[in-house]
């Protein structure tokens, strides 16, 4: 087939439906960029932010993504409204500043917890972290919504399209 399009496709990666949903939030993920969902449920389990700790103790997840962009408050509000359409109850965020993590929620975390969150996301100055606390399925769908909206606010630059196959679909 490569002779028809004058392009060598190479090996096509295969990922399971479960991996696609847990890592990308979609059964049709754009895997050409590195915006992966990260689970911080283990960090949030005992934190002082009850929205997170109560969700984890109730069997839910706290998951998030990092946008390599200093997102404005207006854009955060827009993202919050948009993820609500996907069933999210809210959208927590932390901005990475030269002084460290900054947000209305940081006061509920210990320095060690904040350090672990920053490390989990490999976050640096100028990044904005977004979190959703909910059941696993809803946290995945919310990430897909944020990914789409991040194109509009400039926090995402897609690379070349990457072919892949998704297999082992859930029976639902």
Residue ranges of each PLM-predicted region?
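Class II aminoacyl-tRNA synthetase catalytic cores and aaRS-like
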Residues: 1-172
């Amino acid at each position: 087939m490569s002779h028809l399009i004058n392009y060598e496709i190479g090996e096509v990666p295969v990922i399971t439906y479960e991996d696609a949903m847990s890592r990308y939030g979609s059964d049709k993920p754009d895997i050409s960029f590195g915006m992966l969902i990260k689970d911080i449920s283990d960090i949030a389990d005992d934190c002082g932010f009850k929205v997170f700790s109560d969700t984890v103790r109730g069997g839910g997840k706290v998951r998030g993504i990092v946008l390599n962009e200093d997102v404005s408050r207006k854009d955060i509000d827009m993202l919050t409204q948009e993820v609500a359409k996907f069933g999210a109850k809210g959208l927590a965020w932390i901005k990475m500043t030269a002084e460290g993590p900054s947000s209305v929620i940081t006061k509920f975390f210990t320095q060690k917890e904040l350090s672990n969150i920053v490390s989990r996301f490999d976050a640096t100055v100028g990044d904005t972290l977004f979190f959703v606390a909910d059941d696993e399925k809803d946290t995945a769908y919310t990430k897909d919504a944020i990914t789409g909206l991040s194109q509009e606010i400039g926090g995402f630059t897609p690379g070349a399209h990457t072919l892949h196959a998704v297999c082992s679909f859930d029976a639902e």
